[in-house]
Amino acid sequence: MRKKQFTLGFLLFLLLQKIIFAEAYDWEKYNITKEQYLLLNEIVESLESNHLIKKEYIDIKDEVSKLYLERLDPNKTIFLSRELVGFEKEIRKSNEIDHGLQQAFLIFKKYRERYLERYNFQLNFLNEVVKKDLQTNKLLLRDRSNANRLDSIPELKTLWKELIINDLIQLRLSNNSLEESRDKIIKRIDNQLNYFNQTDSEDVFDIYVNSLSSIYGPHTAYMSPKNTEDFDINMRLSLEGIGALLTSDGLYTSISSLIAGGPAEKTGNLKPSSPS
């Protein structure tokens, strides 16, 4: 008996340690790095000095923050109207570039908390939903990009619930049983959560800096190392998919040969050793 108690206690200890480490890791991965502070200042300096459109950070910082918030929560299902007022108030406290980045990260952490709250609320509702819940006749605005933000948490929860009910009804109309519909939506929100949990400091930085750069024009953008790698991979796959074999010298990628009869050879637009 004592051995079983010890084993159970040890397993609970390990589980608690995993939870503590998981929470610490989740918090740590959303911290700003020194390199990001330096990089942002370099980007701002470069934009102010070299861009054809002359704009100073101090003049556009409120616009940058507004765009950042729109990109985080475009459908207005996360933040309340009063929360945006609070965010804007904090942002206006300083014109320092570092302060703007700090506020962006604090806002994202709040976003993450509310995102998890929404996930848990919708999951609990899905586990308890019955057919009677679907017997409703309401007009639901799916695209809320031009709607006003809600004023309270109860209003948000009502919206979260109505969005799930709408999805359930749509699936039921496609001849899915209630159980099948529930399982499909749970799988979808689980996948969304898994994808969301892969975000880190680099992603938050990317959203903020691109909110900044896009103020200078639609063709001004920042590509993080992660996005650059994804772009290179997609470009490589695209070229290989049309029958072009690539080689790299570590700095440049070039076309070494074309597969006979492949789309690239047939069009005649690409030649070996052409820069990719």
Residue ranges with predicted function:
Residues 3, 18-20:
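Generic signature of intrinsically disordered, low-complexity, basic-rich segments
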Residues 21-276:
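Flexible, low-complexity junctional segments that flank or bridge functional domains
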